[in-house]
From Swiss-Prot:
UniProt GO molecular function: structural molecule activity
The protein's assembly and partners: The basal body constitutes a major portion of the flagellar organelle and consists of four rings (L,P,S, and M) mounted on a central rod.
Main location: periplasm
Top-level taxon of the source organism: Bacteria
BP GO terms, sorted: bacterial-type flagellum-dependent cell motility
UniProt keywords, alphabetically: Bacterial flagellum, Periplasm, Signal
Gene field: flgI
One Gene Ontology CC term in the entry: bacterial-type flagellum basal body, distal rod, P ring
HAMAP family (alphabetical): FlgI
Family indicated by similarity: Belongs to the FlgI family.
Leader sequence residues: 1-22
Name of the molecule in the record: Flagellar P-ring protein
Length: 367
């Protein structure tokens, strides 16, 4: 069994090298469970030079009092802790799936009160929790701040970058491992970045061709399930081969993305425009299609073929015109509109009108 598996891996590597104009599985899909997990915690930064939360910030005072109580220092009733050297902060971090206990990671520190700057501050021991409420890391250390703020007695102030936030490189120590299906599941699931039925089918076919029939199965447009080796010692090599398999994904749906605020228009390569005429302000866009019949010679073995010859004409009031080449694609229309000096707003309005008229064979998305 092990020998057959090694032979399949060698064959896979050989066939992968022969693929042309294809994409690797690792570039278009991610392995379920292999992800970044967000952690968050609430803490206190101390040691600030008078730039902490202002006196009267209730949650900062209560947090500081609770911390002192936990350290065995009793605060007399009614005594207020007035200190501008403390700031309440949120601590965030990203925990990778395969990081282990004892390893360290960077954390981000952000003030949640009215602190002016965290420069020179030290974060006190703060637990970092995941979405399940469990503590996965503990953070503490000196805050590195890239911004600075200064103010004068007359009220004038200067601020460079953002002094109310910072980072602690390697400021958190991992205390618990993230549960990962990679270790205990009988199968591995790949999730496509852009769900597509054709891509999922081709991906499963490519895996089955190289690793054996029945190894992979596309369960929907976004997921492909692959049988995993039972021995954990074989899974790393197995996934290494899988993620480098190359195949040709399915063509993306015809889409037009419009950013109405910036005037940006992004058009996919397979967008086609049907016969239509659009008038917008002082612009007139005409699209015509003429049938062209190709008739074979007498006694020839060919057959009659009918095709469409398209022509686009764009005019302004000053009689400027722009004739586009044959074949009406949206790229040709946009190029022609731009040639006569149309604004991005004109382009967007014309595209929306074409879509409403049913002349645009694409999905129009406005962001």
């Amino acid at each position: 069994m092990r020998r057959m598996l090694v032979i399949r891996w060698i064959l896979a590597i050989h066939l992968i090298a022969t693929q042309v104009f294809a994409e690797r599985i690792k570039d278009i899909a991610t392995l379920a469970g292999v992800r970044v997990n967000q952690l968050v915690g609430y803490g206190l930064v101390v040691g600030l030079s008078g730039t902490g939360d202002k006196t009267g910030t209730k949650f900062t005072e209560d947090s500081f009092a609770n911390m002192l109580t936990q350290l065995g220092i009793n605060i007399p009733p009614g005594v207020r802790l007035n200190s501008k050297n403390i700031a309440a902060v949120m601590v965030t971090a990203n925990l990778s799936s395969f990081m282990k206990k004892g390893q360290t990671m960077d954390v981000n520190i952000s003030s949640i009160g009215d602190s002016k700057s965290l420069l020179g501050g030290t974060l006190l021991l703060t637990p970092l929790k995941g979405a399940d409420g469990r503590v996965y890391a503990m953070s503490q250390g000196n805050v590195v701040v890239s911004g600075i703020s200064a103010s004068g007695s007359d009220g004038s102030s200067v601020t460079v970058n953002v002094p109310s936030g910072g980072r602690i490189p390697n400021g958190a120590t991992i205390e618990a491992d993230i549960p990962n299906p990679f270790y205990y599941s009988n199968s591995l699931t790949y999730n496509l970045h852009n769900p597509d039925f054709t891509t999922a089918k081709r991906m499963s076919d490519a895996i089955n061709e190289l690793m054996g029939p029945g190894t992979a199965k596309a369960i929907d447009a976004g997921s492909v399930v692959v049988t995993a080796p039972k021995k954990l010692s074989q899974r790393v090599d197995y996934v290494s081969v899988l993620e480098n398999i190359e195949f040709k994904p399915g063509e993306a749906m015809a889409k037009i993305i419009i950013n109405a605020r910036t005037g940006t228009v992004v058009i996919s390569s397979n967008v086609i425009v049907k016969s239509a005429a659009v008038s917008h302000g002082n612009l007139v866009v005409s699209i015509t299609e003429t049938p062209v019949i190709s008739q074979p010679n007498a006694f020839a073995s060919g057959r009659t073929v009918s095709t469409q010859q398209s022509q686009v004409n764009i005019q302004q009031k000053n009689n400027r015109a722009f004739i586009l080449p044959k074949g009406t694609t949206l790229k040709d229309i946009v190029r022609g509109i731009n040639a006569v000096g149309a604004t991005p707003a004109d382009v967007i309005s014309i595209l929306e009108a074409l879509q409403q008229a049913g002349a645009l064979s694409a999905t129009l998305i406005v962001i």
